[in-house]
Amino acid sequence: MEQYYGTGRRKEAVARVFLRPGNGKVTVNGQDFNEYFQGLVRAVAALEPLRAVDALGRFDAYITVRGGGKSGQIDAIKLGIARALVQYNPDYRAKLKPLGFLTRDARVVERKKYGKHKARRAPQYSKR
């Protein structure tokens, strides 16, 4: 059986996505997609690359995702699915790239500096 693989990362989340020809079943860490991202409206964004190339019901997705929070995991899955689709059909790159699905979002949390409360929040300063 043929399968296509893509890795997606976002913040601290890492998603490994395996696409196999099927009927649209999506499994995340052994659970159904809707069960894993229960009640999160944003979760449907993870499947946008499949919608963009009209492949929503043509593949089963087996996904393992670790680290980060749910939002980062959703974006990691989105990138992983897009990369797996390009592996399946390199012509999809032309559709997915302009929509931003193949771009790794490199923004990460800025580190806390000493002498400050947070990354940028400085202690209150009194002029007089």
UniProtKB/Swiss-Prot annotation:
- One example GO MF annotation: tRNA binding
Q: Which organism is it from?
A: Thermus thermophilus (strain ATCC BAA-163 / DSM 7039 / HB27)
Pfam families with a match to the protein in the record: Ribosomal_S9
Q: How does it assemble?
A: Part of the 30S ribosomal subunit. Contacts proteins S7 and S10.
Please indicate which superkingdom the organism of origin belongs to. Bacteria
Tell me which InterPro entries the record gives. Answer: Ribosomal_Su5_D2-typ_SF, Ribosomal_uS9, Ribosomal_uS9_bac/plastid, Ribosomal_uS9_CS, Ribsml_uS5_D2-typ_fold_subgr
Ranked from the top, the taxonomy reads: Bacteria, Thermotogati, Deinococcota, Deinococci, Thermales
Q: Which residues cross the membrane?
A: none
Name this protein carries in UniProt: Small ribosomal subunit protein uS9
Q: Which UniProt keywords apply?
A: Ribonucleoprotein, Ribosomal protein, RNA-binding, rRNA-binding, tRNA-binding
Gene Ontology CC entries for this record: cytosolic small ribosomal subunit
Q: What does this protein do?
A: Part of the top of the head of the 30S subunit. The C-terminal region penetrates the head emerging in the P-site where it contacts tRNA.
